[in-house]
Amino acid sequence: LPRIAILDGYPLENHSILANRLIIDDPDGLNQYYQVEDRKHGTAMCSLIVKGDIESRCPYIPSPLYVRPNPDDINRREFVPNDTLLVDLIHRAVKRMYEGENNEAPVAPSVKIINLSIGDPDRCFYHTMSPLARLLDWLSYKYKVLFVVSAGNVYNEIHYNGNEAYFKALNRQEQEVLFTTNILNNRRNWRLLLSD
């Protein structure tokens, strides 16, 4: 039985890391709209949960991963269709897991952790809980589930004003420190993503 769920892009089901480790629930028939090149993000996120960092020696999670694909658009950016409210989409997906839908049985009532990527670059946090945040709080309480919420993908470039040769000469750990410092120095522009 699945213990972890992800609401994100459609993965490649037969990827070497993911084969026989996923339970994909696609009640909206999104599979037909996802081409192979559109499945990179979903595959990467599912692989990260199932196996951890690809370079680490982490063991596979012991149970299958429940996957509820979300819509994607031709620009390959996460989005919610114009005729859908995000709160409705999330509510329907989670309720289907624990209570079922259309007189069907629940599809993943054993899930205790739900990974969700919901960044909205047009709506910054201003110290008031959004309707979606309230919904997640209520769903968490009602179904006794933990939501792991990612702020979403960052499409802005991260600029480095230093010398390219210097950067390339650094080892990986030094590059990561420089990269992270650069992000933290620019956090005023990413309030939604990085809190103080």
Name these PLM-found stretches:
Residues 1-26, 32-86, 125, 144, ...:
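Subtilisin-like serine protease catalytic core
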Residues 74-194:
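Substrate-binding/access-modulating region of protease and related hydrolase catalytic domains
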